[in-house]
UniProtKB/Swiss-Prot annotation:
Belongs to the prokaryotic GSH synthase family. One of its GO terms (molecular function) is glutathione synthase activity. Its cofactor is Mg(2+); Mn(2+). This is Glutathione synthetase. PROSITE patterns: ATP_GRASP. Keywords: ATP-binding, Glutathione biosynthesis, Ligase, Magnesium, Manganese, Metal-binding, Nucleotide-binding. It catalyses: gamma-L-glutamyl-L-cysteine + glycine + ATP = glutathione + ADP + phosphate + H(+). The keyword Disulfide bond does not apply. It comes from Rhodopseudomonas palustris (strain ATCC BAA-98 / CGA009).
Length: 313
């Protein structure tokens, strides 16, 4: 089976191919003989009822510094593709949301992965609140009195922006923290939406587990251990990747989430688990494929394409 595939992503020249999951998906698609086109979100347009984009044919190579070749730009009706990979990174802003509205117009006749309507309606730090029984105590708010009441009840907390990503602007706030007032003011000026305040989990020092689900089924995992002098375990922030197995509790979390993800068309999802607590459900542009493979884990890119091909058969 040869599929016509388009990928909407950030500029390919800027990606770090060693850790980039989109690149892993493209390598696998190319190995299977699929025809790949590339475009950035700013090249997507709605002309009357037609969703079009200025795309370029794409060839990829697993060679740092020489990892891609692009063809000449061409304007294409997006309905002509079998599959579109929605893979640009957050911020989950109005530009991102608009692209999901446009791609929703071609789905499911053209299979968009992940389902753009579900991506739009499942922001990582809000969608997870559908599963509070699996989470640490969590508050979504920008009300100072509400936040202080939560801190008084739960002690040390983590405070982070609702639509942040990659570990940016994540802070631990101690029970009697003299910096809280300044931090509150900074967040109030910087972020218009509410923020996430979550009970601090000390076991994060032993790792924040990224678990990948493909079409609702467990596909692989990596434990991300923070640097000694940092709270954040994100690999882009210096976290170290380590091989791992799932605990019974983590398997229970996967079993609970799986059917909900599948029914929403969220085919490729990364969840974050600390000390048996679910903290985030990443649906926009999940990462971890290459780290899992590098540590001897399963070939998740192959699993994803197996599912995509089955849906297109």
């Amino acid at each position: 089976m040869t599929l016509k595939v388009a990928v909407q992503m950030d500029p390919i020249a800027r990606i770090n191919i060693r850790g980039d999951s989109t690149f892993a998906l493209l390598l696998e698609a190319q190995a299977r003989g699929h025809a790949i086109s590339y475009f950035t979100p700013d090249k997507l347009s709605l002309r009357g009822n037609d969703v079009v984009a200025s795309v370029q044919s794409l060839k990829v190579r697993d060679q740092e510094g020489d990892h891609f070749t692009l063809g000449e730009p061409a304007r294409v009706d997006m309905r002509s593709y079998d599959v579109v990979l929605l893979r640009q990174d957050p911020p989950f802003d109005l530009a991102y949301i608009t692209s999901t509205h446009l791609l929703e117009r071609i789905h499911p006749a053209t299979l968009v992965v992940n389902n753009p309507a579900s991506v739009r309606n499942a922001p990582e730090k809000l969608f997870v609140m559908d599963f509070t029984e699996l989470m640490p105590p969590t508050l979504i708010s920008r009300d100072k009195d509400e936040i202080n009441a939560f801190r008084a009840e739960h002690g040390a907390v983590v405070m982070k922006p609702l639509h942040g990503h990659g570990g940016a602007a994540v802070f631990r706030v101690l029970p009697q923290d003299i910096n809280f007032g300044s931090l509150y003011d900074m967040f109030a000026v910087t972020f218009r939406e509410p923020w996430v305040i979550q009970r601090f989990l000390p076991e994060v020092k032993h790792g924040d587990k990224r678990i990948i689900l493909v079409d609702g089924e467990f596909a692989g995992a990596v434990n991300r251990v923070p640097a000694e002098d940092d709270l954040r375990s994100n690999m882009v922030r210096g976290g170290a990747a380590a091989a791992t197995e799932l605990s019974p509790r983590e398997r229970e979390i996967c079993a609970t989430l799986g059917p909900k993800l599948r029914e929403r068309g969220l085919l490729f999802v990364g969840i974050d688990v600390i000390d048996g607590y679910l903290t985030e459900i990443n649906v926009t542009s999940p990462t971890g494929i290459r780290a899992v493979a590098r540590l001897g884990g399963p070939d998740i890119a192959a699993k994803i394409w197996d599912v995509i091909e089955a849906k297109r058969a």
